[in-house]
Design a protein with these regions (language model features):
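N-terminal alpha-helical transmembrane segments of multi-pass membrane transport
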Residues: 2-87, 207
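Membrane-water interface regions at transmembrane-helix termini and the short interhelical loops
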Residues: 3-15, 35-44, 64, 108-112, ...
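Helix-loop-helix module between adjacent transmembrane segments
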Residues: 12-29, 93-94, 114-212, 237, ...
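Central hydrophobic cores of alpha-helical transmembrane segments in multi-pass inner-membrane proteins
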Residues: 32-33, 53-70, 95-103, 123-134, ...
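Hydrophobic alpha-helical segments and their helix-loop junctions in multi-pass secondary transporters
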Residues: 38, 64-69, 172-175, 179, ...
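Interfacial loop-to-helix junctions that mark the boundaries of transmembrane helices
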Residues: 41-53, 111-121, 186-196, 368-383
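Membrane-interface helix-loop-helix modules in multi-pass membrane proteins
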Residues: 63-64, 75-143, 295-306, 310-326, ...
């Protein structure tokens, strides 16, 4: 299709036609979102809204893939080297805003506070390295892939084979995380099982990339970026307005950070919180004690669980209690190796949950100067590693083969940084807004009055969100919340 291929057009005409297409697309997307919002207000079930979003996006990406089909090698592998810098920057931003950024960035900042800024600094710093040292030279050599570049630059097949191996290894590890994110989002929005969500995502990827290669992927990613940034910004703006009446979360969250800091000091001294953390500490100590003699501990656990089950049956206890006791017996480790692994995991988990929460705004936390110095060094080392890793990602570097010139390669990196900045500048605000919500609206709530979304997330994946009344007081404490970063 000429609108995505630019056949018979000058570069200027091609960009003008793209501007019209994506302006029309943006208007259509806005109208679609407004329509679904109206239908929701009219009583349309949320599951149907999730299905509508999923179907619309899969059809959209598949349609772009079909319209971008090509048999030309240059079009298939490097989109004809005609992608304007701004659109390549948008596609690169979409390519980069993967599960780690879109799903996990705010969660990482929520869980680690100041320490999470290492990811933002490292990832954005990596693009500076790309702009200065990599993108222009990759485009100058004019190959199709990174292994092609290595083969042309260093000669022979040895460098090429090393590049192939590294690209496959890195891409495989990277794709696993993305597929997990696809399954997670699909399961949450539509109610489909996680496994079905993974296959739906894989089918969409196949349709949008198989026929058109890099050309199809490029224009699909441009369309994706608009959806991603809108989907990310809307809830953050809504939370900002809700808590501060300010629609600019990047400005407003400083005010809430002060409140979060004050609430943290209160929770660190709260007697109920200390009680719950003490229970976790006792559980960790018990697990550590079991690890000293695993066979004896396993035998004692089996005897206690079996005895409890027999007592419940003898007393004609409620069926639910008998089922729970039966499940507890069945869940016991089958052998000493499994028992050792279970006790080790229990010790690790309970030790972590017994620790006081990190202060969100505290840089380089540690119990003494030596620990804080180690934390500082780890922060800087992480920034450095992330910079180098970002600059070497194969799927990012390949994007700079698609621009018309070396100059536009540099410009597209600048545009990439801008489009990524929009999300990364918002992620710290989202982390603080969510933490303020958790501290003020969830902590202290009676267990029988908790919002329904907690149970729904527990069904999707208990490691993402689960609560339990550890001290049996009927009130939810912060230490009783198990929250995974991906849920934020």
């Amino acid at each position: 299709m000429s609108v995505f291929g630019g056949e018979g057009q000058t570069q200027g005409q091609f960009q003008q036609s793209l501007n019209k297409v994506f302006l029309f697309y943006g208007g259509g997307f806005a109208a679609f979102v407004i329509l679904l919002a109206v239908l929701e207000q009219m009583g349309m079930p949320k599951e149907y809204i999730g299905y509508a979003f999923l179907a619309a996006t899969v059809l959209l990406y598949g349609g772009i893939g079909v319209m971008s089909r090509t048999n030309d090698a240059a079009e298939y592998y490097v989109a004809g080297r005609r992608v304007p810098a701004i659109y390549n920057g948008m596609a690169t931003g979409s390519d980069w805003m993967s599960a780690a950024s879109f799903i996990g960035m705010a969660g990482t900042l929520y869980l680690t506070g100041y320490g999470g800024l290492a990811f933002i600094l490292g990832w954005t710093g990596g693009y500076c390295l790309v702009a200065l040292f990599l993108a222009p030279y990759l485009r100058k050599f004019g190959q199709f892939t990174i292994p092609d570049f290595l083969g042309a630059r260093y000669g022979g097949n040895t460098a090429r084979l090393i590049g192939v191996f590294a690209a496959i290894l890195v891409s495989f590890v990277y794709v696993v995380a993305q597929i997990f994110g696809v399954g997670l989002i699909t399961a949450r929005l539509t109610g489909l099982s996680f496994e079905v969500g993974v296959y739906v995502g894989l089918a969409g990827i196949l349709v949008c990339s198989f026929l058109g290669g890099m050309r199809a992927v490029t224009w699909t990613q441009v369309a994706q970026y608009l959806i991603l940034i809108v989907a990310y910004m809307i809830p953050v703006v809504w939370l900002s307005v809700k808590h501060t009446s300010n629609p600019v979360p990047q400005v407003a969250y400083g005010y809430l950070l002060e409140k979060v800091t004050a609430k943290e000091e209160q929770l660190l001294k709260d007697p109920k919180e200390l009680e719950v953390r003490g229970i976790f500490k006792a559980r960790a100590d018990a697990a550590a004690e079991k690890l000293k003699d695993v066979p004896a501990a396993l035998a004692a656990d089996r005897e206690a669980a079996t005895k409890k089950l027999e007592e419940l049956k003898a007393a004609n206890a409620p069926e639910a209690e008998i089922k729970a006791a039966t499940a507890a017996v069945a869940a016991l480790p089958k052998d000493e190796a499994a028992a050792k692994a279970a006790y080790t995991a229990a010790r690790t988990t309970n030790t972590a949950r017994a620790a006081p929460p990190l202060r969100h705004a505290e840089p380089f936390p540690g119990k003494d100067d030596a620990a804080r110095d180690i934390s500082r060094k780890n922060f800087l080392a992480l920034v450095f590693c992330l910079m180098i890793g970002t600059a070497a990602l194969p799927h990012i570097l390949m994007r700079f083969y698609t621009v018309p010139s070396v100059r536009e390669a540099r410009e597209s990196v600048a545009w990439s940084l801008f489009f990524i900045f929009l999300l990364y500048f918002t992620a710290p605000a989202l982390a603080v807004l969510v933490k303020f919500d958790i501290y003020t609206l969830l902590v202290g709530t009676p267990m029988d009055q908790l919002p329904g979304w907690i149970a729904r997330w527990n069904v999707v994946d208990p490691t993402l969100m689960s609560v339990s009344d550890i001290n049996k007081d009927g009130i939810l404490q912060l230490a009783e919340i198990r929250l995974g970063g991906d849920i934020v």
